[in-house]
Amino acid sequence: MSKRLQVLLDPDEWEELREIARRHRTTVSEWVRRTLREAREREPRGDLDMKLRSVRAAARHEFPTADVEQMLEEIERGRGAEREGSR
């Protein structure tokens, strides 16, 4: 079932929205609905506490890593080998 939303605007705001809607070849109501949907989609979803628990759980694990300089050297060596192989 649809619900109604009433938003009070001053006349200048209303005229600006009418002009925007007209440029988009739609009604003010449809433009507002579409804009609200887009804004809602940009909002973060999910439970923040759950996300924090997941990050904390992952941080408790230990994974093998190398020294940053060593990793960069290995990457560069790999790129050099790729370049030589493509010749």
UniProtKB/Swiss-Prot annotation:
Keywords: Toxin-antitoxin system. It comes from the Bacteria. Putative antitoxin component of a possible type II toxin-antitoxin (TA) system. The cognate toxin is VapC13. This is Putative antitoxin VapB13. It comes from Mycobacterium tuberculosis (strain CDC 1551 / Oshkosh).
